[in-house]
């Protein structure tokens, strides 16, 4: 189902498509010794080790004391989010970006981040970053190519991707032999994250994006563009699931490799098709013990 009908302007990322994927259910492990373990009933005959009760929240909640006690109610969550947005200058609402940005605004956003450090930098072999390497990295910013007016394009992240200080994979370090912290690594974005694209690198492989939490460079093949309403509306309504484990993965599905074994990190929120027919497969896979979720793809 193609949701973006127009071709991206200025050769922005591939058009956005939403695909279905199976999110595997992991049985949470709890150690509430004082709470008796409920009887899960007879196992299902067609899936080894699976009981129907395992697929319900009630079964797991019954193993906990005070399972229904809220940590934060809706009003408290909204208040905390409001404080975060007010106090953290990096939190931004990309929905409120103007339809046109001046070249100066775009360049300022880029150069505020992409400023070469005054200290010496080394590669992973302990060699100082050569002047010609630095020049090539800085030239790839493409600042002279920013048009006088820029219309932000909107996109969804399709896979876990690094946010970088400069449009390069070149890893740099402050100390010879200490390669724990890459000084060009800023943050990361995850499947379903929404971004506004305002510039492309000279080599065409990187995009400068604004996300809710950060503005930085992301590899172009990690995002799929769509119209603003579709991108901002993704997952905004209807049922959803939030990953609470360190990571989760979609099911292996060779029929749709774009969403096969896709890593989903803690905090990722995806729209779920709660009314998916039990007997109907998803990408050739039986969905009985999984959540059927929508994921953006290129």
Model-derived features: positions:
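N-terminal secretory signal peptides that target proteins for export/translocation
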Residues: 1-12
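Bacterial N-terminal signal peptides
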Residues: 17-27
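Sec/Tat signal peptide C-region and signal peptidase I cleavage site
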Residues: 29-33
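Boundary regions of SH3-family modules and the immediately adjacent low-complexity/disordered segments
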Residues: 34-164, 169-180, 210-250, 254-257, ...
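Short, charged beta-turn/beta-strand-edge "cap" motif at the junction between a beta-strand
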Residues: 199-204, 275-279
């Amino acid at each position: 189902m193609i949701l973006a009908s127009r071709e991206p302007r200025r050769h922005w990322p591939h058009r956005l498509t939403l695909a279905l994927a199976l999110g595997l259910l992991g049985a949470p492990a709890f150690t509430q010794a004082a709470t008796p373990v409920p009887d899960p009933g007879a196992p299902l005959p067609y899936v080894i080790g699976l009981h129907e009760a395992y697929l319900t929240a009630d079964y797991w909640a019954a193993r906990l004391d005070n399972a229904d006690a809220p940590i934060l109610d809706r009003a408290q969550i909204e208040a905390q989010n409001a404080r975060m947005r007010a106090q953290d200058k990096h939190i931004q609402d990309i929905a409120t970006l103007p339809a046109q940005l001046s070249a100066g605004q775009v360049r300022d956003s880029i150069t505020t981040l992409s400023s070469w450090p005054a200290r010496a930098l080394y590669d992973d072999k302990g060699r100082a970053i050569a002047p010609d390497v630095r020049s090539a990295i800085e030239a790839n910013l493409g600042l002279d190519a920013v048009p006088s007016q820029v219309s932000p394009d909107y996109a969804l992240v399709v896979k876990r991707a690094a946010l970088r200080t400069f449009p390069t994979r070149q890893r740099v370090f402050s100390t010879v032999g200490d390669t724990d912290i890459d000084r060009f690594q800023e943050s990361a974005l995850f499947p379903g994250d929404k971004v506004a694209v305002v510039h492309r690198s000279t080599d065409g492989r990187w995009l400068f994006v604004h996300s809710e939490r950060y503005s930085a460079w992301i590899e172009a093949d990690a995002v799929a563009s769509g119209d603003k309403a579709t991108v901002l509306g993704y997952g905004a309504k209807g049922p959803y699931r939030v990953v609470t484990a360190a990571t989760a993965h979609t099911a292996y599905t060779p029929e749709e490799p774009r969403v096969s074994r896709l890593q989903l990190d803690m905090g990722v929120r995806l729209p779920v098709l709660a009314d998916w027919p039990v007997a109907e497969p998803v990408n050739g896979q039986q969905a009985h013990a999984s959540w059927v979720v929508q994921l953006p793809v290129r």
